Amino acid sequence: ADITFMALHGSIGENGKLQATFDNLGIKYTGPNSLGCTLSMNKLVTKQIFKTSGVPTPRGTSLTVKTKDTRLDELGYYLPLVVKPCSNGSSIGVYICHTEEDYYDAIHKSFDIDNTDEVVIEPFIKGREFACGILAGKALPLVEIVPKDGLFDYANKYQAGGASEICPPVSLDAETQELIQRAGERAFEALRMDVYSRADFIVSDADGEFYCLEMNALPGMTAASLLPKAAKAAGYEYSELCEAIIQESMKARY
């Protein structure tokens, strides 16, 4: 085969190890390179890179098994908070915590997922969620995500009807949409990505500021996925999107 189409998600597909193995074996593949995947999989590293690259992102800190019971006031964080594994995908193990009981329960649950050894906490930002697909370094139209159950979790991502998705958004002015798209492109470049990926943003209800939450190295490509919706709004049929990904990957790998 000329190239392998990467359609994996979570740690096995997005942490860069498979990409590095393919590089060593001389196997061509679609999607971002191993470095971009490795950097984006670690949520704390991603935050640090975003901050130095001028990409707005919520502050955050990590906890290990040894520090997981540290009091919140000692950490300088206050409820409500988001708790999530430092390295995982598909929103698995993400919890919104409004009470201390919720928080400590979420911490312990997060450490139980796939032998997680590090968990990230960050302030919970109430707001509207937007996905910014990036293809060949250029932002696609934004997709607004309105989860039916309040959180765009694993079930809502992969279940038909789990969320309403509006592309392009009608609730956000054109200027802010463009600012988010440019921030998505900066995030893509800062993480040394190539070919395609998807940056997830939230616009705060409190002050209207936007924040990049994370970068998805291999965004979903199912019928219910966000990247194909954004690409369609940009004029790509599904087959054309796949062809564009293959062509960009061939350029990057050869």
Task: Give the label of every model feature segment.
Residues 1-59:
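Conserved N-proximal alpha/beta basic substrate-recognition cap immediately N-terminal to
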Residues 10, 91, 148, 216-230:
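Glycine-rich phosphate/pyrophosphate-binding beta-alpha loops
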Residues 39-128:
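Active-site nucleotide/adenylate-binding loops and adjacent lid/helix of ATP-dependent enzymes
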Residues 63, 94-99, 134-136, 204, ...:
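Short beta-strand-to-turn element immediately C-terminal to the catalytic PLP-Schiff-base lysine
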Residues 98-182, 209-211:
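Phosphate-binding site of ATP-dependent enzymes
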Residues 123, 188-221, 231:
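Conserved metal-phosphate-binding beta-hairpin within the catalytic cores
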Residues 144-197, 229-254:
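Active-site "cap" helix and flanking loop/linker of ATP-utilizing ligase/carboxylase catalytic domains
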